[in-house]
Each structure stands twice: as structure tokens, then as C-alpha cells.
Amino acid sequence: MLQPKRTKYRKPHNVSYEGKAKGNSYVAFGEYGLVATKGNWIDARAIESARIAISKCLGKTGKMWIRIFPHMSKTKKPLEVRMGSGKGNPEFWVAVVKQGTVMFEVANIPESQMIKALTRAGHKLPVTWKILKREEVSA
């Protein structure tokens, strides 16, 4: 699973996923991309399961790019612990995905297969999404 090698701070503040993406909003490498139409936090397990779903459809010639990375840790207090006494320990890693962020890109396979691969990956993610062609703009 994806996670940073090291971070400056163990417990970051919660970053908002509201609003539109400033960067990473167009298909840069592949021919088709999977774009978030609403924002959310996507954890490393969901990214990994989407990656596996795409790679099963790619074959030998297909190419995939993962455009998001889980940089932020999410904390959680243990079960049956009273409130207070500090913030909980880091439990998992999430990527902050805003509206319009390109999450995955694919290329070098037939168009129908690319759409099938991105659709399967999209069903693994906790965001609403659409498939974007390279020439189109995600607005």
C-alpha cells in the first residue's frame, strides 16, 4: 500500500476537500483519465484496489499512471476511550481529492478496454467520477 517514507509532522490538521482542484485537473500522460466530480478523502487501500482493477484490464501493452498519493495521515482514538487526553494515533493514510482532480490515467490499449478499466477502478473509489478523454477539459 502507498504511504510516505517520512513526514515532517505525524498528525496533520484535517485538510478540506471542498472546492475545485487547483492543479492536476487535465489528462497529462495517458489517453483517458478518471476524474473526481466531488471531493473526498481516498485512503491508500482504495487506491490500491483501484490500481489492481486497472492492471487486470491492461495486459502487456497497456500503461497506467496514478496521479494521487496518500500524503496525509488520519488519526483515530481506540474504542471505548473517553474523550480528551489528546489526539489519537495515526491509523491510515489518505489522499485529499478535490472536484476535478484526475486520479488515474491509462493508454496503449483499445478505447473500449480503457473505458472498462477506468469504470472498474471507479467503482472501488468513494467519490463520484467521470471518464475524461485527453482533449476534453474537466470543468
From Swiss-Prot:
Similarity-based family: Belongs to the universal ribosomal protein uL16 family.
Entry protein name: Large ribosomal subunit protein uL16
InterPro entries, alphabetized: Ribosomal_uL16 (IPR047873), Ribosomal_uL16_bact-type (IPR000114), Ribosomal_uL16_CS (IPR020798), Ribosomal_uL16_dom (IPR016180), Ribosomal_uL16_sf (IPR036920)
Role according to the record: Binds 23S rRNA and is also seen to make contacts with the A and possibly P site tRNAs.
PANTHER family, sorted: 50S/60S RIBOSOMAL PROTEIN L16, LARGE RIBOSOMAL SUBUNIT PROTEIN UL16M
Keywords in alphabetical order: Ribonucleoprotein, Ribosomal protein, RNA-binding, rRNA-binding, tRNA-binding
GO cellular component labels: cytosolic large ribosomal subunit
Gene3D superfamilies in the cross-refs: Ribosomal protein L10e/L16
GO biological process, one term: translation
Listed NCBIfam families: rplP_bact
